[in-house]
Amino acid sequence: MEWREEGILLSTRRHGESAAIIEVFTPSHGRHAGVVRGGTSRKIAPILQPGAQLDLTWRARLEDHIGSFLVEPVRSRAAAAMGDRLALAGLNAVTALLGFCLPEREAHRPLYVETERLLDLLGEGEIWPLAYLRWEVQLLHDMGYALALEACAVTGQRDDLIYVSPKSGRAVSAKGAGDWADRLLPLPPILRGIGGGPDAEIAQAFITTGYFLTEHLARDLGGKPLPEARARFVETFSRRL
């Protein structure tokens, strides 16, 4: 068995004396693990940084074996992240969430495209939080938790939408909320793709996407806690408000 494709490095861990096991995200093969022989060596270890874009060749005797990777660097994203606390926190959040959420060896091409685009924006501090928010919405969509924000779930109206139902992920208008308003999640305009995305609105939107990541996605994955890297990114972002 063999395939070759570019992918994004999600994580690496030592395996034996000199090898490493890496997890990558690729367009056609999804989240995929494999052994890199010599992965802890001075030559290869610097290549295996989270977020790195790699040219990957995977080989195994049988399809269900872990197999091994040959890796070649395409581009590193470490430099953009290391000089910027927000970028580093964001990179860690993206790779941790993908490792947490993605089923093994299942393609999610639209999410891959959005992930590559997002990581290529690392270091662009003014636009990156909004790009990350849109990526979280895409992540929820691809994992089966799409938000439906075009019309009120109660009245059907398409204006004055200011809440999200924590159960259904559907928008709710001020009129439709009634006495339930204090139990609903915020729906800032930026979450509907309206406006330029001021930081205060993005912070509100993170409350809503974070709820669905924690209370729906993570719970359905056996109740495992969401990776702390996501909370650290939101906290780092909130410091600039």
Curated annotation (Swiss-Prot):
Record-linked Gene3D superfamilies: Nucleic acid-binding proteins, Recombination protein O, C-terminal domain
Superkingdom, natural source: Bacteria
UniProt KW DNA repair keyword: yes
InterPro entries: ARFGAP/RecO (IPR037278), DNA_rep/recomb_RecO_N (IPR022572), NA-bd_OB-fold (IPR012340), RecO (IPR003717), RecO_C (IPR042242)
Keyword DNA repair attributed: yes
GO biological process: DNA recombination; double-strand break repair
Keywords of the record: DNA damage, DNA recombination, DNA repair
Cellular compartments per GO CC: bacterial nucleoid
Recorded family membership: Belongs to the RecO family.
Annotated function: Involved in DNA repair and RecF pathway recombination.
The name this protein goes by in its record: DNA repair protein RecO
Organism: Roseobacter denitrificans (strain ATCC 33942 / OCh 114)
Lineage: Bacteria, Pseudomonadati, Pseudomonadota, Alphaproteobacteria, Rhodobacterales
Annotated gene: recO
